[in-house]
């Protein structure tokens, strides 16, 4: 009996702090959120006739200044050029600056980000992007392709675009990726990209549709709902 009482006392001593810690802190949400397959399909259907479309379904308050978004993304067939390929295509057309990752007018109007380099390597990839305050977790649901990840942004331009529903918030883009690696992503694969890490699509033979699970800190408007699924 004494041993039983001791075990109960020890269990209580362990569990009570855990239960107290598990309680939502004041001001944090106390309810869960459901996003149905029907809602996801409804948003996805509006994207299928576009080259690239990325929309969040909802911005959900998850407490302590964090929000969680579910991105629904469609990309049709595409192939990204290297700096060398773009320069060859642009030779003689007066668009060499764009081949290096940007153009003079845009560079003059925006704040540079990433490393600035007059002549990036020929194998650098166009379309590099990073997000300042958002992690992305891709889950491929249809199609697939070759993504590029990691490395550094060269000749980027800072984006402060931050509409209520995202999709991503401020970041660095418009430049080229140096030192990235390519990865194949197909149905069922998952890619997790922390804030500040380069990601993009190098080659999509037909299309790719994916869900992006996006915890963000301090950049989205909690409670925002995509107009396509918002209650009228």
Task: Name each model-derived stretch.
Residues 131-151, 162-173:
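Short, conserved beta-strand element in jelly-roll/cupin
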Residues 21-128, 223-232:
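A short, N-terminal "cap"/entry segment at the start of jelly-roll beta-barrel domains
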Residues 188-189, 197:
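Structural motif
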Residues 9-20:
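Bacterial N-terminal signal peptides
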Residues 1-10:
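Bacterial N-terminal signal peptides that target proteins for export
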């Amino acid at each position: 009996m004494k041993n039983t009482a001791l075990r109960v006392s020890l269990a209580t001593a362990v569990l009570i702090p855990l239960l107290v810690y598990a309680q939502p802190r004041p001001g944090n949400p106390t309810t869960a959120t459901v996003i149905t397959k029907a809602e996801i399909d409804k948003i996805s259907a509006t994207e299928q006739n576009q080259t690239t479309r990325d929309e969040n379904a909802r911005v959900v308050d998850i407490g302590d200044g964090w929000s969680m978004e579910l991105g629904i993304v469609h990309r049709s067939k595409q192939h990204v050029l290297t700096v060398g390929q773009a320069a060859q295509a642009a030779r003689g057309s007066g668009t060499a600056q764009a081949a290096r990752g940007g153009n003079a007018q845009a560079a003059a109007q925006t704040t540079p980000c990433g490393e600035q380099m007059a002549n990036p390597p020929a194998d650098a990839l166009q379309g590099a992007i990073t997000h300042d305050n958002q992690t992305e977790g891709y889950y491929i649901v249809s199609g697939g392709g070759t993504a590029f990840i990691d490395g550094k942004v060269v000749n980027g331009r800072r984006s402060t675009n931050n509409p209520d529903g995202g999709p991503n918030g401020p970041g660095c883009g418009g430049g080229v990726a140096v030192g990235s690696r390519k990865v194949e992503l197909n149905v069922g694969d998952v890619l997790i990209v922390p804030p500040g890490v380069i990601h993009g699509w190098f080659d999509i033979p037909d299309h790719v549709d994916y869900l992006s699970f996006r915890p963000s800190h301090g950049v989205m408007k909690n409670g925002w709902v995509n107009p396509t699924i918002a209650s009228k």
